[in-house]
Amino acid sequence: MAVPAALILRESPSMKKAVSLINAIDTGRFPRLLTRILQKLHLKAESSFSEEEEEKLQAAFSLEKQDLHLVLETISFILEQAVYHNVKPAALQQQLENIHLRQDKAEAFVNTWSSMGQETVEKFRQRILAPCKLETVGWQLNLQMAHSAQAKLKSPQAVLQLGVNNEDSKSLEKVLVEFSHKELFDFYNKLETIQAQLDSLT
């Protein structure tokens, strides 16, 4: 006896409205919309469509801006749930039928998920495991005068400049971290510990 799929989609009022809007979308254009959203799903910081593209979608699907956003958000939510639960295509179709999505739209979801689902799940895994990658390291020394007029000693500070690559933005972000002598020494010791553990695994 087959185990029923966990309920991942519920018929809330907003879901019901979104389903009625999705059911009315031109079936010929719908698969391309799904493909685009699924391709960009793992890029949280990046919208699936530009403002200009959204205006074209409004005209193509005869939707108000608010309704278009509800449709796009609902499609993204359905696909995110599919990724999170790593559902099989047949289970996804069952879920979509439960929320009364028309058969042609449900089949478009299932076909898109069948061809791109596992690739998308893998992209999410990579994003969770390695959201940022260290690309560059720079450093400099700063000498700060003590605030007390009686204290003439300067306090040296090391400044590390880390260039990290974020997959969401595809751009290099510079992070500045300032260390006192003690903080840098503690940081060095932690790096030594990490290096020793890495060496023991290789």
Curated annotation (Swiss-Prot):
InterPro entries: COMM (IPR017920), COMMD10 (IPR037361). It is found in: Cytoplasm; Nucleus. Residues 133-202 form the COMM domain. Keywords: Acetylation, Cytoplasm, Nucleus, Phosphoprotein, Transcription, Transcription regulation, Ubl conjugation pathway. The keyword tRNA-binding does not apply. Coiled coil: none annotated. Ubiquitous. This is COMM domain-containing protein 10. It comes from Homo sapiens (Human). The lineage of its organism: Eukaryota, Metazoa, Chordata, Craniata, Vertebrata. The gene is COMMD10.
